[in-house]
Amino acid sequence: MASSNRHWPSMFKSKPHPHQWQHDINSPLLPSASHRSSPFSSGCEVERSPEPKPRWNPKPEQIRILEAIFNSGMVNPPREEIRRIRAQLQEYGQVGDANVFYWFQNRKSRSKHKLRLLHNHSKHSLPQTQPQPQPQPSASSSSSSSSSSSKSTKPRKSKNKNNTNLSLGGSQMMGMFPPEPAFLFPVSTVGGFEGITVSSQLGFLSGDMIEQQKPAPTCTGLLLSEIMNGSVSYGTHHQQHLSEKEVEEMRMKMLQQPQTQICYATTNHQIASYNNNNNNNNIMLHIPPTTSTATTITTSHSLATVPSTSDQLQVQADARIRVFINEMELEVSSGPFNVRDAFGEEVVLINSAGQPIVTDEYGVALHPLQHGASYYLI
């Protein structure tokens, strides 16, 4: 059908009906009805440019009729149908067959152009809309990674919690400690003062002494009176329990003496073991060798025990001095100081001049520490 309508302007000149051709000639809007110069006209009239044709502006009623016919599927109406459409449009204004024909041609080109624009727009919008569902797997992957990271961090937290568990009289004491594993020396005074009294916590990290922050008052710590309620065992040591009467007596004694609150931070296999004897009040400190993922703490394989012989340090409460070890203030006995019992076998204590403190075979310093002096552990 499109090929038959290719040469429409020539078909209008064929004059199939004399009345129709006469009507087209009389129409001022047809291209053939332009002002022609007659052969008998003068030369000045021939030189005159033809007047411009007025453009056909269809009325709203005519546009509605044409749109209804075009939307019904008649994109290229045949010649007979064009005449019928023109007769229908003439009820609302003057119109020619060529006007109807060209309106359908323009309407078809406009629809094609509109479809082309929609197709291009959809083609450009597809790459933008397709990546939008992609963040979902990334979100799922991020959620899975976050869940996996949370899973990976949960065991660490549980490890820290397990590390800070202390079995005291058959119950577990949970402490709030820094995440770094540290070896802390507690204050130890029962009856007569024995060993050393640490006014602040002392920690080893990678062989260096660093100061641990004191826990807040709300920290779940162990008072010395609670430590003396029973022995905190390491490994398979049997726990010993005291009677309620002895416990109350211990608490009354410890409440009379001003003491600081102590928190114990332990590693996987490191725990302090205290054995309370009613006779000599010895304090036994079991320090097995440990290896942590964050730090490596090397201690002696042998049991660091306060000797119960003449080498045992028994210092009265009024015979104590204060020294600075690794910039930390400590209160120690004024007599010979046992370095091995306090810090382990492999630790060497040096003074501010860099000279090591000479000790005997039991780890006791040959010369007492000087009051107010500074010492360092290596």
From Swiss-Prot:
Signal peptide: none annotated. One of its GO terms (cellular component) is nucleus. The keyword Metal-binding does not apply. Its main location: nucleus. Expressed in the basal cell and later at the boundary between suspensor and proembryo. Expressed at low levels in proliferating tissues post embryonically. Detected in vegetative shoot apical meristem, leaf primordia, floral meristems, emerging floral organs, epidermal layer of the placenta and in the upper portion of the root meristematic zone. Gene3D superfamilies: Homeodomain-like. Induction: Up-regulated in the zygote after fertilization by the transcription factor WRKY2. Residues 1-60, 123-173 are annotated as: Disordered. Disruption phenotype: Embryonic lethality when homozygous. Reduction in embryonic growth, failure in axillary shoot apical meristem and leaf-primordia initiation and growth, and failure in primary root growth and lateral root initiation when heterozygous. Wox8 and wox9 double mutants are embryo lethal, with embryos disrupted as early as the first cell division in the embryo proper. Residues 51-115 bind DNA. It is found in: Nucleus; Cytoplasm. Keywords: Cytoplasm, Developmental protein, DNA-binding, Homeobox, Nucleus, Transcription, Transcription regulation. GO terms for molecular function: DNA-binding transcription factor activity; transcription cis-regulatory region binding. Residues 32-42, 137-152, 161-171 have a biased composition (Low complexity). SUPFAM superfamilies: Homeodomain-like (SSF46689). One of its GO terms (biological process) is embryo development ending in seed dormancy. Residues 45-54 have a biased composition (Basic and acidic residues). InterPro entries: HD, Homeodomain-like_sf, WOX8/9-like. Belongs to the WUS homeobox family. The seedling growth arrest phenotype of the stip mutants likely resulted from a G2 cell cycle arrest of the meristematic tissue. Exogenous sucrose in the growth medium reactivate the stip meristems by repressing TSS and activating the expression of cell cycle regulators, and thus promoting G2 to M transition in meristematic tissues. Homeodomain transcription factor required for meristem growth and early development. Promotes cell proliferation and prevents premature differentiation in meristematic tissues during postembryonic development. Essential for maintaining tissue growth during embryogenesis. May act by repressing TSS to promote meristematic proliferation. Involved in the transcriptional activation of a subset of cytokinin response factors. May act as a negative regulator of cytokinin signaling in the dark. This is WUSCHEL-related homeobox 9.
